[in-house]
Regions:
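Thiotemplate assembly-line natural product biosynthesis machinery
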Residues: 1-22, 75-83
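Helix N-cap/coil-helix junction residues
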Residues: 18-19, 37, 55
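Glycine-rich loop motifs involved in handling phospho/adenylate chemistry
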Residues: 26-38, 60-69
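Phosphopantetheinylated carrier protein domains
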Residues: 42-66
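Short, cationic-aromatic polyanion-contact patches
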Residues: 68-76
């Protein structure tokens, strides 16, 4: 996983994720929904990531699985950037 992407994902999660845990210290594979993120917050996270990375999540990536963990989000961002 790209460390720059991970850092930015954590920053967006801190601002938009409404997590009950600190986004900077949560494990990359921790379930963000169990950490307090709601479906509404995940939409805000997606919008924040689109702004930060100047990307657009394609429809097939708009799934709960994409936003379940820092790792899954970072992998999706990296894949979108490489498309």
């Amino acid at each position: 996983m790209n460390s720059t992407i991970e850092t930015t994902v954590r920053s967006v999660l801190s601002e938009q994720g409404k997590l009950s845990e600190d986004a900077q210290s949560i494990a990359v594979d921790a379930d963000l929904y169990r950490a307090g993120m709601t479906s509404h917050a995940s939409v805000n996270v997606m919008l924040g990531l689109e702004d930060e990375f100047d990307i657009e999540f394609p429809e097939e990536r708009l799934t709960k699985a994409t936003f379940t963990s820092i790792q899954s989000i970072a992998e999706a961002v990296e894949a979108i950037q490489n498309d």
